[in-house]
Design a protein with these regions (language model features):
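Short, compact, well-ordered microdomains
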Residues: 44-78
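A generic alpha-helix propensity feature with a strong bias for hydrophobic helices
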Residues: 13-16, 31, 36, 63-64, ...
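Short, intrinsically disordered terminal segments enriched in charged and Pro/Gly residues
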Residues: 1-29
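A short, structured beta-strand/loop element
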Residues: 19-50
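Polar low-complexity intrinsically disordered regions enriched in Ser/Thr and small residues
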Residues: 5, 25, 32, 41, ...
Length: 78
């Protein structure tokens, strides 16, 4: 199961938060129902970016300042 980048789409774009979600095993490319930090993914957008390989970041560099710290910890500890 891969990690998908899912983006909370708030009313204010400067409050963007990037979360990690596992990939749904039944529908590849769709996120699981909740993020790694436990937030519902139903209203989130899936970013098409994928890590280049083992050891690379799970999120695109342009989102580095917007990563959910709880998702980051969950991905690193997995």
């Amino acid at each position: 199961m891969g990690i998908l980048v899912v983006i909370e789409q708030p009313e204010q774009p400067d409050l963007l938060v990037v979360h990690a979600s596992g990939s749904d095993p039944d529908v590849p490319g769709d996120p699981l129902p909740v993020t790694a930090c436990g937030i519902d993914t139903a209203s989130m957008a899936v970013d098409p970016w994928r890590p280049s390989g083992p050891g690379s970041r799970w999120y695109p560099p342009q989102y580095a300042g917007h990563v959910c710290p709880r998702c980051e910890r969950a991905v690193r500890s997995a």
